[in-house]
Amino acid sequence: MKSKERRKILRKAGDKNFKALDKSFIEFYTLLEKSVFFRKNKKRKYIYMNPEISKMNKIMKLYFKKPQLTFEIDDNIAPIRFETEDGVVISGLKYITDPNSKKWIISCHWFTGHKYWSLYWAKPFIELGYNILVFDFRNHGESDSTDLITLGLLESKDLVAAIKYLTDNEKPQTIGLLGMSMGAYIINYLTVTQQEFLKKHKVKFAISESAYGSIETLLSKIYRSRIKRFFNKKMDNKIISDILKSQEKATLYDWTEMNIFDKYEKENVKPAQIPILFIHGNNDRYTSSSDTTRLFINRSRTIKNDELLIYNFSGHCTSLKEHYNQTVYRWLKFENKIINDDDVTKKALEKLGIVDKIIENNFNESLEISTFYFKEE
């Protein structure tokens, strides 16, 4: 993300406290993308390679050290554009694994991310035969710029529009959703606000990584991490309440509407009957793993097919880098629980380098002794 784009995002954040919060999300991936340099490949001078694909391939090889996640050429990548219900034009991509496939993954990036991060996160599903749709949320990448950034409230309209676009143009039989951080929040938000819509559009499962369940808990986590001092609960609640009030004045939106916990615990909302695999790391600096656990527990009252994976050591949205073997294994086995195609899953795992020897050796974990993983049998 360029400095000009970064300043534009911060100007729209509203209250000054939100500017500080938003800035903390920007720092890491901006630095990572700027650190990658390129040289021309003389052997492939006649092959056009999208510069973003080239950059992301470098990141996957040099930083993630996962060549399995790279793309060779992008002949089967097509740009798309679609419009949201409030008139925002969204920029996206379709990756066509198989023109005859009716299985699709929609992958949703984190705050300050972009569609190419979403595409690379979805790479394991290509080995299962899924086509992929990715897009830039409003105020990100090549999508329209708007007056406000809301960390999920208005951005949820973008995912709704993506699902509608996919249904209208591709007639999928199965849609899976994959979300990271803000993208994960939005998926969870839609499960408690758009239940019939998700059922109608054949959304069958979702994966949620590093989600937050409310702006209140997100603020609490960020400020405890940044300010480095102890707040008692009373002080914590007052500070967050004051921030939200000033944010509502700045944006003219009710930010308490974004509290998913209230929908479960106070309003007794029943979520869409879509199983979710929840993933988080206990040492995440930006969102709390307790949010993910709390979402899982709230959903367990009505949904028995969810799974929960909590790493002791995994940074914000880094499970694919730090725990590649176990994360991809859990993703694909979770999908197979819903879709039931053992042969395809086995071949995909082998192609991605996840063989029995690695699985039996605790996924070759170097950071974990015992990872918390739960599913109901």
List each model region and its residues:
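The serine-hydrolase catalytic nucleophile loop
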Residues: 110-124, 290
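Short glycine-enriched nucleophile-adjacent loop
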Residues: 184-197, 206
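Serine-hydrolase catalytic core
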Residues: 241-343, 360-375
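Conserved alpha/beta-hydrolase
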Residues: 125-144
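An N-terminal hydrophobic leader/cap segment in hydrolases
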Residues: 1-83, 93, 346-349, 367-377
